[in-house]
Amino acid sequence: MVAVGKTSAIAAGVCGALLLGYCIYFDRKRRSDPNFKNRLREKRRKQKIAKERAGQSRLPDLKDAEAVQKFFLEEIQLGEELLAQGDFEKGVDHLTNAIAICGQPQQLLQVLQQTLPPPVFQMLLTKLPTISQRIGNAQNLSEDDVE
């Protein structure tokens, strides 16, 4: 019975030593790589860009009425779902996208003012100018492509 405990202790010690050796070997290999820092910076930059893009919905072709309508309905639905789950930031972002693309934003704002709690509606009003500007910039870029 003592032999089993001693054997398992030796096995655990050997496994620990192998793990430590493995870590030291790959750490040394990583540090000696001349491109490591460049690859790490590039990876972090890509992650940052991906994170920024995840927060922004992909805008539809503003000349395609069907795509705009589909985008509008998806944004309203996503916004409502996220607000129901308690994620007010993302929910308001999606509702703001829908308002910015909407053909009659004043009527939609009136409906939202009646249905949303006042703090959430205020959050929506503060985000609306930045989202509208982004969509306006996207529209200007698409017009520049045509010229």
From Swiss-Prot:
Query: Mitochondrial intermembrane topology: which positions?
Result: 1-3
Q: Does the keyword Protein transport apply?
A: yes
User: Where does the UniProt annotation locate this protein?
Assistant: Mitochondrion outer membrane
| SUPFAM superfamilies xref list | Mitochondrial import receptor subunit Tom20 (SSF47157)
What GO MF annotations does this protein's record show? mitochondrion targeting sequence binding; protein transmembrane transporter activity
User: Would you tell me the Gene Ontology cellular component terms?
Assistant: mitochondrial outer membrane translocase complex
**Topological domains, Cytoplasmic:** 27-147
Membrane-spanning residues: 4-26
Q: How does it sit in the membrane?
A: Single-pass membrane protein
Q: List the disulfide bonds.
A: none
GO BP of this protein:
intracellular protein transport; protein import into mitochondrial matrix; tRNA import into mitochondrion
Q: What keyword terms does UniProt attach to this protein?
A: Membrane, Mitochondrion, Mitochondrion outer membrane, Phosphoprotein, Protein transport, Transmembrane, Transmembrane helix, Transport
Spell out the InterPro entries in the cross-references.
Answer: MAS20, MAS20_rcpt_metazoan, Tom20_dom_sf
According to the record's subunit comment, the protein's assembly and interactions are:
Forms part of the preprotein translocase complex of the outer mitochondrial membrane (TOM complex). Interacts with tom22.
| Family annotation (PANTHER family) | MITOCHONDRIAL IMPORT RECEPTOR SUBUNIT TOM20 (PTHR12430), TRANSLOCASE OF OUTER MITOCHONDRIAL MEMBRANE 20 (PTHR12430:SF0)
State the protein's purpose: Central component of the receptor complex responsible for the recognition and translocation of cytosolically synthesized mitochondrial preproteins. Together with tom22 functions as the transit peptide receptor at the surface of the mitochondrion outer membrane and facilitates the movement of preproteins into the tom40 translocation pore.
The family this protein is said to belong to: Belongs to the Tom20 family.
- In its UniProt entry, what is this protein called? Mitochondrial import receptor subunit TOM20 homolog
Native source species: Xenopus laevis (African clawed frog)
Q: Lineage from the top down?
A: Eukaryota, Metazoa, Chordata, Craniata, Vertebrata
